[in-house]
């Protein structure tokens, strides 16, 4: 069952769902709570590697990722991040989100931004039960013009769904969880995957 605005507000008041900073009441509507853009980004460096072999040896995968990912870029107050056409970048939400083990979150981009060519999440829009941390956004500009993105602008919306029972393996209890407590624009940790499974 997806939570309505009234239930989202109540879950926030009761501390079942934690969002920091706490959203204003007017950020909650229908079945979502608005989230804003944070100030940390990463970009892919052009021509630093001919390719990334995602199924190669872990050390080679990590080495390739280290070559293609920029250091984290932290914007000063009032500055904009420019995402150019055809460019992929990582960013974080301004808000940190903590979910209990019986609620899954769903991140959706804004229609107004999509109509300008901005994809807020390339594929990863599920926020697992037991998650705690900032959410990394995978931005892609499929439009024709560069887009200026500013910290604290409204970037997307989260909805929440109650599971039929608490998850047996919530994110915060998993040994293989790669992004626990992330607070920055964390690059892919695919090299940590167990390739034998």
Swiss-Prot record:
Q: Which UniProt keywords apply?
A: Hydrolase, Nucleotide metabolism, Nucleotide-binding
Q: Where is the active site?
A: 138 (proton donor/acceptor)
InterPro entries associated with the record: dCTP_deaminase (IPR011962), dUTPase-like_sf (IPR036157), dUTPase_trimeric (IPR033704)
Per the UniProt record, which EC number(s) apply here? 3.5.4.13
Does the keyword ATP-binding belong to this entry?
Answer: no
Single Gene Ontology BP term? nucleobase-containing small molecule interconversion
- Among the Pfam families in the record, one is DCD
At which positions is dCTP bound?
A: 110-115, 128, 136-138, 171, 182
Q: Which Gene Ontology molecular-function terms are recorded?
A: dCTP deaminase activity; nucleotide binding
The annotated pathway is: Pyrimidine metabolism; dUMP biosynthesis; dUMP from dCTP (dUTP route): step 1/2
- Which chemical reaction does it catalyze? dCTP + H2O + H(+) = dUTP + NH4(+)
Looking at the keywords, is Nucleotide-binding present? yes
Matching entries from HAMAP family are given as:
dCTP_deaminase
**Annotated function:** Catalyzes the deamination of dCTP to dUTP.
Q: Which family does it belong to?
A: Belongs to the dCTP deaminase family.
Which NCBIfam families does the UniProt entry name for this protein? dCTP_deam
UniProt subunit comment: Homotrimer.
Spell out the protein name for this chain.
dCTP deaminase
Q: Which organism is it from?
A: Alteromonas mediterranea (strain DSM 17117 / CIP 110805 / LMG 28347 / Deep ecotype)
């Amino acid at each position: 069952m997806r939570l309505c605005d009234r239930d989202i507000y109540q879950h926030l008041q009761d501390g079942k769902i934690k969002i920091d900073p706490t959203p204003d009441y007017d950020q909650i509507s229908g079945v979502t709570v608005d989230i804003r853009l944070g100030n940390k980004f990463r970009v892919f460096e052009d021509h630093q590697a001919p390719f990334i072999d995602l199924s190669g040896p872990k050390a080679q995968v990590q080495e390739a990722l280290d070559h293609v990912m920029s250091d984290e870029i932290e914007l000063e107050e009032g500055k904009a991040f420019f995402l150019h056409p055809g460019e992929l970048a990582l960013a974080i939400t301004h808000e940190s989100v903590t979910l209990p083990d019986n609620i899954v979150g769903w991140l959706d981009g804004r229609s107004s931004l999509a109509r300008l060519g901005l994809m807020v999440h390339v594929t990863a829009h599920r926020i697992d039960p037991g998650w705690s941390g900032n959410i990394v956004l995978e931005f892609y500009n499929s439009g024709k013009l560069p887009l200026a993105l500013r910290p604290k602008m409204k970037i997307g919306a989260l909805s929440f769904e109650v599971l039929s029972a608490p998850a047996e393996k919530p994110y915060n209890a998993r040994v293989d969880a790669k992004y626990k407590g992330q607070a920055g624009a964390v690059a892919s940790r695919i090299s940590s995957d167990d390739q034998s499974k």
